[in-house]
Amino acid sequence: MTTDLSDDGSRVVSRRNFAALSAGALATGLAGCFGDDPQESANGNGSSTGNGDREYTIFASMPAVWDFVRQAAGDHMEAIDLVPVGEHGHDWTPEPGMVEELDGAAGFVYLRDFAAWQDDAADQLEGRDDVHVIEASDGIEFFDSPAEDDDEHWWMDPVECQNGVENIADGLAEIDPDNADDYEANAATFIDELEALNEEFHDIVERAELNSIVVATHDSFQWWNRRYGIDIYSPVGTSPDDAASPGDVEEVETLIEDLGIEHVLYDVGEPAPLAESLAAEVDAEILPLSPVETQIDGSPEVDPSVEMEPDWGYVEHFRELNLPTLETALRAE
């Protein structure tokens, strides 16, 4: 584990590592046909903007991207999230027959460098005339965060998200130029919502007594440090497969006591035994965060009092989970 300095000189504890997925295994996973009706597949989560009768179907590579697509598409296109409800978008990979054909799809929207299967799928689909590949991250510069070099979690920043939404709207307009003005207008409406989230973030930070949080599951949140100056400490890396060493945990326990932190935060899409044990060790409470990488129907494993809906979009994940958690953890109530 490394202890790094943020832009304002504060310490941020995390591990600079990430797991790469096997390209060989991916090739097997891209070997067949998705099916006549993607929404009926047991693999996809079936989330869409409508009833399946629209002319165009767009496949998204993870939940946040799916919501950006449906917001920009409006009534003109179906948006399908390939990641099943309950699966974590960071470490899920397609089963054989899910991606290569994408029967009926007009587009595939993905995140660069987020998961190996997405980049490989985009490379394979680029050669096809019937599927338009849209890189949501196009033109977005990753940065070397305390969690990892080239931290790709830009969608956690509501301001940076605005660029991603515009990229998607531009791609949809290329697929369906007759409705280009609508895609631009839909994106502008959603960008207004993202800007409202940004203002709510700033309001919480301005009212906060603390400036630090501890995340005891994988660290997807360092873009909040860059945008809002929130110091984020984690004994875990940026992948759900990363593990914390006893030394990492002990260092974070010391930081919790030194900084007067009263809450340990966890990713709702992951089991969180470390968050629970760490909270018990330092007499803290656990609170949920969402990196918008998992759709959940009901409650996360850790806390049955948290109720989620499988069709929540980006704004719901932030307003129902992230902002209330930060308000409490940073003592901005």
Regions found by a protein language model. Name each.
Residues 2-15, 19-29, 33-333:
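Extracytoplasmic metal-acquisition and chelation regions
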